[in-house]
Amino acid sequence: MRGNKEKDITQKTLEMYNDVFADIINVLLFNGEKVVTEDSLTDVLQESILKMDGRIRAQYRDIAKYWHNSKIKLSMFGLENQTKPEKLMPLRVFGYDGAEYVQQAKKENSKETKYPVITLVLYFGYNCRWNQPKSLFELLDIDERIKPYVNDFKMNLFEIAYLDREKIDMFKSDFWILADYLYQMRVNKDYVAGDTVIKHVDELLMLMTAMTRDYRFEKTINEVKGKEHVTMCEVLDRVEARGIEKGREEGIKEGTVNVLISLVKDGILSIADAAKRANMSEENFIQYIK
C-alpha cells in the first residue's frame, strides 16, 4: 500500500546522504554558512529504547547523525519529516531527544563528553501553514498554579514551502529542488522546473513520486538511469511525454470501445465477442454500455 509510509521512506533515503543532510543543517541553522561538512557526520542508530510498563519499547526517529570534531561529538542532529500538521509532534520530539539524553546518562557513558541533541521538524505542506502545537505548553492542559514549575519544550519547526525565496536558494544539494518545488506550488500553484543537475536521481524522483502521487516520476527512473547531467527539466519533459502517450492510448481505446458498443446495439456482435475484442471482461464491457 502506497501512502504516508512511502513518503517517509523516500524522504529518509534522500536525507540520509551526508551532502543533503549537511546542506539542510547549514541553511536552516547557520544561514547557509558551511559549518557542518559531509565528512564530519556519522549515522546514528535510529532506534531509541524505552522501558514502559515493564516492557521494552522502541522509538524510531526519521533520521539522525552525529556531528564530530575529530573524535569528539559536538552534537546529535535529528530530522523529522511531516507532510501534514500533527498535534502530538512536540511530545514525539521530546521523547526522541529525551531518550538520547538518557543514553548519555547511563553508567557506561559517564566519562564520555556530553553533547546537545537538536531535532529539526521539516514540514513539507504547501496548502496550509502548520496549525498544530509547536511546544509542550501549547499541548498540555496545565493548572496555572503549577505552570511556573513545568518545563516547556519548543520544537524547531521549519515550514519549507514558507521559507523566504532567498533562504530557499541557499540550498546547494538536491534538497533545493524539493524546496523550490514546494515554494513554487505554494506561491504559483504550478511548478516550472529549472536546469539544476540532479545528483541523487533515483532518490529524488522517488521522493517526487511520493509527494505528488504522480507515478510517472518513478517510471522515469529507468529511462534516465546511467545518464549524466539529468535535470528536472528533462525529467518533466519525459513525464509530460508519458502523459501525452497515455492520453493517446486511452483515446484510441475509448474510440474502439464506442465502435464495439454500436455493433452490439445493432445486433452485429454479442457482448462476449465485443468484450473479447476490447480485451476486457464481459462485466466491465457492460459497464461501458450503461
Roles of regions detected by a PLM:
Residues 1-290:
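Elongated, amphipathic alpha-helical interaction scaffolds
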